[in-house]
A protein has these predicted regions:
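Short Lys/Arg-enriched alpha/beta "domain-start" segment
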Residues: 4, 8-10, 14-22
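Divalent-cation
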Residues: 22-48, 66
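Short acidic-glycine loop/turn motifs at beta-strand connectors
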Residues: 56-61
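Conserved small/polar residues in nucleotide/adenosyl-binding loops
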Residues: 78-80
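Polyanion/phosphate-binding surface patch
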Residues: 50-54
Length: 80
């Protein structure tokens, strides 16, 4: 599998988990485990509205994906 495809798959996994309300540590760990299963050494950073996944190819080229997470089912204080 190509590195871009693996990175996109990991980013999509993290996006779906975050959008579904998963805890941040679970998102980071799941994406990390998925990509390390393919022999990669990823760096994963997640905050409630953003996911960043990065890795270096064996040739030393960095590849990074960032995905913004729109507001997703959190409590809105405007309606209280």
């Amino acid at each position: 599998m190509e590195y871009d495809d693996l990175l996109n798959m990991g980013t999509e996994l993290g996006y779906q988990l975050m959008f579904s309300g998963a805890e941040i540590y679970r998102v980071e760990e799941s994406v990390y485990r998925l990509l390390t299963a393919y022999g990669l050494q990823p760096q994963v950073f997640a905050i409630p509205n953003c996911l960043i996944v990065s890795l270096n190819t064996p040739q030393g080229h960095p590849i990074t994906r960032m995905r913004r997470i729109p507001s997703h089912g959190t409590l809105s204080l405007i309606h209280i």
